[in-house]
């Protein structure tokens, strides 16, 4: 469940408890480390999403796990169209990397995978059929 996008749920840990106990989701996607930490404690699969807006976002990925927080199972970086940056992130990340956001064709997919991404995420159904 992409917990940040569920209308009516707050960005508090109790929302993760609700998703786990009532919805029985296997995992969550979130931009918030506190939500990821709670989900990990509940035994859920976690994807921590990062929007690559500047070099600080890249540093935050590199520093994952340095503050005694639990590591997510995977990080997702958006947009996923920057092979040079993706390659750098994949080399330094402590967990697998998913490239997402603005992936629109086979070239985008191959560029992300070639840069080291473990997977590609997209809502573009044409890409699903490649």
Predicted features, each with a name:
Residues 44-56, 103, 109:
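A signal for specific C-terminal beta-sheet/loop modules enriched in small/flexible residues
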Residues 36-41, 88-92, 111-112, 130:
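Short loop/helix-cap segments at secondary-structure boundaries that form the rim of catalytic
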Residues 22-23, 42, 67-70, 92, ...:
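Structural motif
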Residues 60-90:
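Strongly charged, low-complexity linkers/loops
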């Amino acid at each position: 469940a992409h917990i940040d996008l569920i209308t009516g749920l707050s960005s508090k840990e109790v929302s993760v408890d609700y998703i786990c106990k009532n919805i029985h989701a296997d995992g969550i996607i979130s931009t918030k480390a506190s939500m990821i930490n709670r989900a990990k404690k509940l035994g859920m699969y976690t994807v921590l999403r990062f929007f690559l807006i500047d070099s600080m976002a890249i540093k935050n990925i590199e520093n994952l796990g340095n503050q005694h927080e639990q590591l997510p199972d995977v990080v997702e970086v958006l947009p996923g169209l920057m092979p040079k940056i993706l390659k750098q992130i994949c080399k330094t990340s402590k967990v697998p990397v998913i490239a997402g956001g603005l992936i629109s064709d086979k070239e985008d997919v191959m560029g992300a995978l070639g840069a080291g991404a473990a997977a590609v995420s997209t809502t573009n159904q044409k890409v699903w059929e490649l």
